């Protein structure tokens, strides 16, 4: 018999899953639609497609983990699921980092030679970073993942894989997150500095005029700030999620921590949609038509 608290957590998990499924699905469809309309990929569309695709997969991985771990806690398939989870999670972080770099490149205006050099080569550097990420993380996950569910303490720990020794391996598996997170913070910091500098200039020269560039700064910073907050919640909840699966597993704790983790791929998709005017208008039209149809066909 499920408790009321556990039932509520399951309901929240289902709602988050549906929000993430619809939100990231809308972003993927919009990216492909833009490609069909223009017959070319823009860097922004590629970033949104990669980010939404990773979030879409990550949402399914969280649901699979919630569904399978009570039944197959010592299964080898969960080891593969964990390795794939780390790869998808870090790929999502890389695409979010590329988005922050894209905003920084398009909005900020600095005259420093190093900034101008990086701005001209941002696209090529991003591709090399992504390729290097896949190679390094593939080697790292193959090396560590083979031992991830085979601790050296004997047969008893093999039966219950989520023991304290695995925090070291989980830490090493997530070590690929440090570089993109640093780049993300640097580019976000540059946006803040650029906004402050631009605000000072506008205050002196253009008082009372509509400030489009400042609005672009603020919109980008809102999106990046929400992503950073949700990602930090996701990172901090991960070790507690692992700890809650130690024998005997606490199902309520598992749902609490993984529901917090699921907020990262689901809620940020809504924030991205709100920041893209055409997608936002399309979603509003679909929602309005759905409400009207429900009223027409309702009792």
UniProtKB/Swiss-Prot annotation:
Residues 23-45, 104-127, 197-223, 275-299 are cytoplasmic. Pfam families: TAS2R. It comes from the Eukaryota. Glycans are attached at residue 155. The keyword Transcription regulation does not apply. SUPFAM superfamilies: Family A G protein-coupled receptor-like (SSF81321). It is found in: Membrane. The keyword Transmembrane helix applies. Receptor that may play a role in the perception of bitterness and is gustducin-linked. May play a role in sensing the chemical composition of the gastrointestinal content. The activity of this receptor may stimulate alpha gustducin, mediate PLC-beta-2 activation and lead to the gating of TRPM5. Belongs to the G-protein coupled receptor T2R family. Most taste cells may be activated by a limited number of bitter compounds; individual taste cells can discriminate among bitter stimuli. This is Taste receptor type 2 member 5. It comes from Pan paniscus. The gene is TAS2R5.
């Amino acid at each position: 018999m499920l408790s009321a608290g556990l039932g509520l957590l399951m309901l929240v998990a289902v709602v988050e899953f549906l929000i993430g499924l619809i939100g990231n699905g809308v972003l993927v469809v919009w990216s492909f639609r833009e490609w069909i309309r223009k017959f070319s990929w823009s860097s922004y569309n590629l970033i949104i497609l990669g980010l939404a695709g990773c979030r879409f997969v990550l949402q399914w991985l969280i649901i699979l983990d919630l569904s399978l771990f009570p039944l197959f806690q010592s299964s080898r398939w969960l080891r593969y699921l964990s390795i794939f989870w780390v790869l998808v999670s870090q790929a999502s972080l890389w695409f979010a980092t590329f988005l922050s770099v894209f905003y920084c490149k398009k909005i900020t205006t600095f005259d420093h030679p190093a900034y101008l050099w990086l701005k001209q080569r941002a696209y090529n550097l991003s591709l090399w970073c992504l390729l290097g990420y896949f190679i390094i993380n593939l080697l790292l996950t193959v090396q560590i993942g083979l031992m991830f569910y085979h601790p050296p303490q004997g047969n008893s720990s093999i039966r219950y894989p989520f023991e304290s020794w695995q925090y070291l391996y989980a830490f090493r598996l997530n070590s690929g997150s440090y570089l993109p997170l640093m780049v993300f913070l640097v580019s976000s910091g540059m946006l803040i500095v650029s906004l402050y500098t631009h605000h000072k200039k506008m205050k002196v020269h253009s008082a009372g005029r509509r400030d489009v560039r400042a609005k672009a700064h603020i919109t980008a910073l809102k999106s990046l700030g929400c992503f950073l907050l949700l990602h930090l919640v996701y990172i901090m909840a991960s070790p507690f999620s692992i700890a809650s699966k130690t024998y005997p597993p606490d199902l309520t704790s598992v749902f609490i921590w993984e529901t917090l983790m699921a907020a990262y791929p689901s809620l940020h998709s809504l924030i991205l949609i709100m920041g893209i005017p055409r997608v936002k208008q399309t979603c509003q039209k679909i929602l309005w038509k759905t409400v009207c149809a429900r009223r027409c066909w309702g009792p």
